[in-house]
Amino acid sequence: MTDLSKIRNFSIIAHIDHGKSTLADRLIQVCGGLTAREMSEQVLDNMDIEKERGITIKAQTVRLNYTASDGETYELNLMDTPGHVDFAYEVSRSLAACEGALLVVDAAQGVEAQTLANVYQSIEHDHEIVPVINKIDLPAAEPEQVRAEIEDIIGLDASEAVMTSAKSGIGIEDVLEAIVAKIPPPEGDRDAPLKASLVDSWYDPYLGVVILVRVIDGVLTKGLNVRFMQGGTQHLIDRVGCFTPKRVDLPEIGPGEIGFITAQIKEVEQARVGDTITTVKNGAPEPLKGYKEVQPVVFCGLFPVDAADFEKLRESIGKLRLNDASFSYEMESSAALGFGFRAGFLGLLHLEIIQERLSREYDLDLITTAPSVVYTVHLAHTKTEDAKVIEIHNPADWPDVNRIDVIEEPWIKATIYTPDDYLGAILKLCQDRRGIQTNLTYVGGASTLRAQVTYDLPLNEVVFDFYDRLKSISRGYASFDYEQIGSREGDLVKMNILVNNEPVDALSLIVHRSVAEERGRGMCERLKDLIPRHLFKIPIQAAIGGKIIARETIAALRKDVTAKCYGGDISRKKKLLEKQKKGKARMREYGNVSIPQEAFIAALRMGEE
């Protein structure tokens, strides 16, 4: 049993690529969590995709024992949290399990957008924040400049910021000493009824669901009968332990400590992040605060390129769901693309990661339809039906235009950091996406002058390709972060694409009336280049309701029917041409247009011109 005053729980906050995982590696090495042979780069990022993109997706924890300069041995629990906005709820749960945080800032790049979002969350949890300036051995490093930036932008006192270089191992001892000295120990009562917060969970093929917990009061031991207060299920604990990053079984997890439990649970669904665990007998009267159901924000259709892969896709999505309860899916069928799934995600990065994991880990080729968001549609009262409010995320379910009273769409508050040179292009991009500018300030010194601009933007304009466009016009220098700010009324319409007068369901979009014509024209032009010519003329149209707003025509291929006539009377040729004309008219009426798979994929990648 560890004395409470000797425990330190902390997380590491950093923007992507500022060296968070490398610093974690060094801390593990110095405290002897792994032998030199077992040490690998980015120990805590288990998935390949986490290592490749240099991002952390699932929260991980490590328990380290450190003997400080005062001769005492401290138990340090490091929570490695995701840094991306899509996983903000996971971050907030991980932060709630700690008392302090290391704020890691790259000495060459300074403070970025996502650092800020997570720092503010950390401050809300009343954390003690220890600034760490990393990568000080880079030639472009300006530690003093960054120190001033931390004080200006975040308002933290950075006079005692720890200077380190995680890669070359400079200053790691100083970081550990700062953790012991500055971060407060947790509070908790060993004899009170058990209260433990569920920080994260994942599926292990041998153990079932592994649950990461932070014990607030009481003690977790093997053989305890526990109840999940929000989920309402009961389980028998069959293993308790911690990670050093290796799995180590322990006799108990006491108050203030972070560890894991398993209870032969088969589905991650039952172990929801943020739930409270207590004993079945004499349990805690009420759960911990801060639990909420995670709602998907962005939706899109996932279809296999080869229809025969549908079963494989169903299986793979089921397996992914075991590990990631925050994404939801339901079956959907489309006339153009066959059977597939409609899936909901926490945000764009989440969508990309799931897509990439499906194609990489399960070897699937997928078509994804245009991402859409959740619209709240108020339907007017009619003779036969009452007025009601419905939520729609699939353009196929769009109600009759005449019944719609008001449509509300989700808006976000976006914070963009960019070097001054690219500001004009970025403001134009936000303007084109119906953004409303709310603030513009400058931060940093002469050599690192950057603009911080905040915009209110409709989420539906951001899900498409906003992030890619932002990165390309700023040559990768701009950083972007967003939070949701509720719904607002919008003049939205459903745009259908008709090929040979038949609507193609997979290409319908919900767009704002002001940009409908432009989008429709772009889509028609693109399809005109992609659909092969047939023996008859094919009209491609974009329509809102019954009104056609854009049209392109694919010219027919002409077979030379008069080639075999040699000399002779003109009426012979006329007869053949008339016959061809009639055949074409009949063909146009009954002919089927085949739209190649590539056309779908390319048409859905609009906005990249």
UniProtKB/Swiss-Prot annotation:
One of its GO terms (cellular component) is plasma membrane. Keywords: Cell inner membrane, Cell membrane, GTP-binding, Hydrolase, Membrane, Nucleotide-binding, Protein biosynthesis. It catalyses: GTP + H2O = GDP + phosphate + H(+). GTP binds at residues 17-22, 134-137. Pfam families: EFG_C, GTP_EFTU, GTP_EFTU_D2, LepA_C. The keyword Cell inner membrane applies. It is a peripheral membrane protein. It is an enzyme of class 3 (hydrolase). This is Elongation factor 4. It comes from Erythrobacter litoralis (strain HTCC2594). The gene is lepA.
